[in-house]
UniProtKB/Swiss-Prot annotation:
<feature type="binding site">
    <location>
        <position position="183"/>
    </location>
    <ligand>
        <name>substrate</name>
    </ligand>
</feature>
<feature type="binding site">
    <location>
        <position position="170"/>
    </location>
    <ligand>
        <name>substrate</name>
    </ligand>
</feature>
<feature type="binding site">
    <location>
        <position position="119"/>
    </location>
    <ligand>
        <name>Fe cation</name>
    </ligand>
</feature>
<dbReference type="InterPro" id="IPR017861">
    <property type="entry name" value="KAE1/TsaD"/>
</dbReference>
<comment type="function">
    <text>Required for the formation of a threonylcarbamoyl group on adenosine at position 37 (t(6)A37) in tRNAs that read codons beginning with adenine. Is involved in the transfer of the threonylcarbamoyl moiety of threonylcarbamoyl-AMP (TC-AMP) to the N6 group of A37, together with TsaE and TsaB. TsaD likely plays a direct catalytic role in this reaction.</text>
</comment>
<keyword id="KW-0408">Iron</keyword>
<comment type="similarity">
    <text>Belongs to the KAE1 / TsaD family.</text>
</comment>
<dbReference type="InterPro" id="IPR043129">
    <property type="entry name" value="ATPase_NBD"/>
</dbReference>
<keyword id="KW-0012">Acyltransferase</keyword>
<feature type="binding site">
    <location>
        <position position="115"/>
    </location>
    <ligand>
        <name>Fe cation</name>
    </ligand>
</feature>
<dbReference type="Pfam" id="PF00814">
    <property type="entry name" value="TsaD"/>
</dbReference>
<dbReference type="InterPro" id="IPR000905">
    <property type="entry name" value="Gcp-like_dom"/>
</dbReference>
<dbReference type="GO" id="GO:0002949">
    <property type="term" value="P:tRNA threonylcarbamoyladenosine modification"/>
</dbReference>
<protein>
    <recommendedName>
        <fullName>tRNA N6-adenosine threonylcarbamoyltransferase</fullName>
        <ecNumber>2.3.1.234</ecNumber>
    </recommendedName>
</protein>
<feature type="binding site">
    <location>
        <position position="316"/>
    </location>
    <ligand>
        <name>Fe cation</name>
    </ligand>
</feature>
<dbReference type="GO" id="GO:0005737">
    <property type="term" value="C:cytoplasm"/>
</dbReference>
<dbReference type="GO" id="GO:0005506">
    <property type="term" value="F:iron ion binding"/>
</dbReference>
Length: 364
């Protein structure tokens, strides 16, 4: 089965073609990502209207490019998968309308995919991970600890009360005057800094629940930067290093508890006759090398296989959407052409909203 994938949930326009066989293995034939960094850089963050217009301008071209690079034609495509949410409504509409039009014109099966499911299943695409496994999803819009039982079967163990980790990285970088996108810039600055210079809090460290909070850490950084102003280049590096160290300590604490919980639920998963259970880190923040190394060491201490997709598949891409769509279609699932985009679409539909996250709950 050959699928065309389309991803337009935020500030990357992406298309891909994959080949998916009956055994559930996929081969990426093309994976095109068009970044809007230059469009949003003057504003220091993503502007939804600009993002949607940029998707409109380039999506058709990228669909043709993905088909050409895969050396295939639309006629040879068996199904079309597109991100249906969560994300920015304007961008989601662009991708959905294009996918629906192609499906209607060609009569191909069509499925709207949860963007988070794309991230959640990327490790199955890249490493043939077996279920169940533990997933830490860390991106610009989401920070969640998820127990992945199977395709369509997700148990949210924890989520953020406030800012997603990627958002905290970007806002801290902006506060320090670092260029957009903030996450990579802050990671680079931290390499030259003293992580012990600025005392910063470790939010929820020691808490027995598996939730996250980063707004207090962000506020502490602002207070420290204000007290030290004007900031020298070394000051910026030291604050960046101290912030990143606080994040890593917090993640270590949360992940340690999650790994213990997984082992208590699946004690036989550590049977030496089988592949060790997997701890997967996915989402854009998973590209941070300091975070990767720390979590890899922690996973190995708990006898877990550590898996982080290659950086190109950590950030938003259409290959993961095509793969998630293929897994759904293989189970007989498709979407109606009148399906609407969802700005919020939790992986775990049964998870209750966190107290203190407002009427609509946490951003899941």
């Amino acid at each position: 089965m050959r699928l065309l994938g389309i991803e337009t949930s935020c500030d990357e326009t992406a298309t891909a073609v994959i080949e998916h066989n009956l055994k559930g293995k996929s081969h990426i034939l093309s994976n095109i990502v068009w970044s809007q960094i230059e469009d949003h850089a003057p504003y220091g963050g993503v502007v939804p209207e600009i993002a949607a217009r940029a998707h409109v301008e380039i999506l058709d071209t990228l669909i043709l490019e993905a088909l050409a690079k895969a050396k295939t034609t639309l006629k040879e495509i068996d199904a079309i998968a597109v991100t249906g949410g969560p994300g920015l409504i304007g961008g989601l509409l662009v991708g959905l309308m294009s996918a629906k039009a192609l499906a209607f014109a060609t009569g191909k099966p069509f499925i709207a995919v949860n963007h988070l499911e794309g991230h959640a299943l990327t490790a199955v695409l890249t490493h043939q991970v077996t279920f169940p496994y533990l997933l830490l999803l860390v991106s610009g819009g989401h920070t969640q600890m998820i127990l992945v039982h199977g395709v369509g079967n997700y148990q949210r163990l924890g989520t953020t009360f406030d800012d997603a980790l990627g958002e905290a990285f970007d806002k801290t970088a902006k506060l320090l005057g670092l260029p957009y996108p903030g996450g990579p810039a802050l990671e680079k600055a931290a390499l030259l800094g003293d992580k012990n210079r600025i005392p910063l809090p470790r939010p929820l460290k020691g808490n027995k629940q598996l939730n996250f909070s980063f707004s207090g850490l962000k506020t502490a950084v602002r207070q420290a930067a204000t007290a030290m102003a004007p900031l020298s280049e070394q000051d910026v590096s030291d604050i960046a290093a101290s912030f990143q160290a606080a994040v890593i300590d917090t993640l270590q604490d949360r992940v340690h508890l999650a790994l213990q919980y997984f082992t208590s639920q699946y004690p036989s998963s550590h049977n030496q006759e089988h592949r060790p259970p997997a701890f997967v880190v996915a989402g854009g923040v998973a590209a941070n090398q300091a975070i990767r190394l720390t979590l890899q060491n922690l996973a190995h201490q708990h006898s877990f296989e550590f898996i982080a997709p290659p950086p190109s598949l950590c950030t938003d891409n259409a290959a993961m959407i095509a793969f998630a769509g293929a897994e759904r279609i293989a189970r007989g699932q498709t979407s109606p052409l009148d399906i609407a985009p969802r700005s919020r679409w939790p992986l775990d539909e049964n998870a209750l909203p966190l107290i203190g996250t407002g009427r609509r709950g946490a951003k899941v």
